[in-house]
Amino acid sequence: MDTKTHSLPITHTQLHSNSQPQSCTCTHHRQTFSQSCRQSHRGSRSRSSSQSPASHRNPTGAHSSSGHQSQSPNTSPPPKRHKKTMNSHHSPMRPTLHCSCPKNRKNLEGKLKTKKMAKRIQQVYKTKTRSSG
C-alpha cells in the first residue's frame, strides 16, 4: 500500500515537469513552422509567376519579330518585378497569422485533454488500490 501511494506524487511531478518543456518546444516549433510557411509560399508563387511570363514571352516573340520584340521585353519586366516584391512583402504576413492562430488553439486543446486524462488515470488508479486493499 505504501509504495503505491508514493508513486502517485511522482507521476504528478512528472506531468508538471513535462508541461514546461512542451511550452518551450511549442513556441520554437511555431517559429520554424512560420518560416517554412513563408518559404513554401514564396516558392510556389515564384514558380507560378515565372511560368506565366515565359508562356507570354514566347507568343509575343513569335508574333512581333519585326522589331517590336526589343520594346516589349524592356517595358514588361519592371512591373513584373514590382509585383514580385509586393507578393514577397505580403505573403510572409498572411501565412504567419493563419499558421499561428489555429496552432495555438490546438495546443491549448491538447493541454486541456492531457490534464483531463491525467486526472482520470489518477482516479482510476485510486479506485483500483481501494478495491484491492
Swiss-Prot record:
Polar residues bias spans: 1-26, 124-133
GO molecular function per UniProt: DNA binding; zinc ion binding
GO CC terms: nucleolus; nucleosome
PROSITE patterns in alphabetical order: TP2_1 (PS00970)
InterPro entries attached to this UniProt entry: TP2
Top-level taxon of the source organism: Eukaryota
Tissue expr: Testis.
Subcellular location: Nucleus; Nucleus, Nucleolus; Chromosome
Modified residues (Phosphoserine): 132
Span(s) of short sequence motif Nuclear localization signal: 110-118
Region (Disordered): 1-133
GO terms (BP aspect): acrosome reaction; penetration of zona pellucida; positive regulation of protein processing; sperm DNA condensation
Family named by the database record: Belongs to the nuclear transition protein 2 family.
Purpose of the protein: Plays a key role in the replacement of histones to protamine in the elongating spermatids of mammals. In condensing spermatids, loaded onto the nucleosomes, where it promotes the recruitment and processing of protamines, which are responsible for histone eviction.
Record's protein name: Nuclear transition protein 2
Organism field: Pan paniscus
